[in-house]
Amino acid sequence: MYYKLVLSHYSKTSTLINITLIKHLINILRERMIQEIKNFIYKYYIEPAEKGTGYNIVQEITYGIILALALYLFYKALRKLNINIDEKFAIPGIVFTVLIALMRALVDCGYIERSFLTITPGIVFLIGGFFILTILTTGLVFKEKYYKASAVIGLILLLYFLFVFLQHITHLEAILYVGILVGIFYYLVKFLDKTLKLNIIQSKIDDYVVIGQLIDASATTIGIGVYGYWEQHPIPRFLMETFGVYAFIPFKLLIILLALYILNKEVEDENIKNIIKLCIMALGLAPGLRDLFRTVMGV
């Protein structure tokens, strides 16, 4: 009997020890997992922003997913308000894209304090969120004239920062260099599209896409080739290191024209087609203008 009691006590004690040990191991694993997650976030998201080392593949994929999700939800809200994604919608879209680019450049020159909300992607979330709120609010209040009200709101902010920008100009000729490249390649595309009857450029929004992406490619090329800047994004950086800086413009142009060709041929819904196109435009116009503004300010 005594032996059974001792054995029972030993068994209970052993069970308690095992449970305590398991809990301890779980806590260790949980703490280690949390620390690994923190290290991952710091390594791939925070550290590159703090040190200005450029973007990495993990960031590109993450921000791409966030952009796609935000775009989908925004599109659904627009359709509920019966707002069509057309040339009118593009007007405030362009204004706010320029605003993001100019503010980001003013962060680089030190006028705006550097923080998560004033650098990419934080500034895109901030101004992009304000743009979405502006469009939805003016859509409710002004109905079909929403785009005028939205553009005016964006212009008020833009004019203030533009005044600041004008006080920091050091390389005004950079605008001419970029403008010449954009003009040459844009009219070359229009000429070939018409002469060869490719029918790739079908609307003003298609023009905006080509011009926006050409501004990005041209500003990058001039910034690196003439003024000694470097490319932050890994894929363009690899291409320029492999094929040369000036090969980036025709390469990017081919990709954009192929994207437009596929969209115009395969996507029937005009609203879906146009919101994708405007997104492509903004992805070129925003970084392109930022690079150009930086170059002009000598930052």
Swiss-Prot record:
Ranges annotated as spanning the membrane: 54-74, 89-109, 122-142, 149-169, 172-192, 208-228, 243-263
Compartmental location: Cell membrane
InterPro entries noted in UniProt: DUF63
Keyword field: Cell membrane, Membrane, Transmembrane, Transmembrane helix
GO cellular component, one term: plasma membrane
Superkingdom in the source lineage: Archaea
Topology in membrane: Multi-pass membrane protein
Protein name stated in the entry: Uncharacterized protein MJ0440
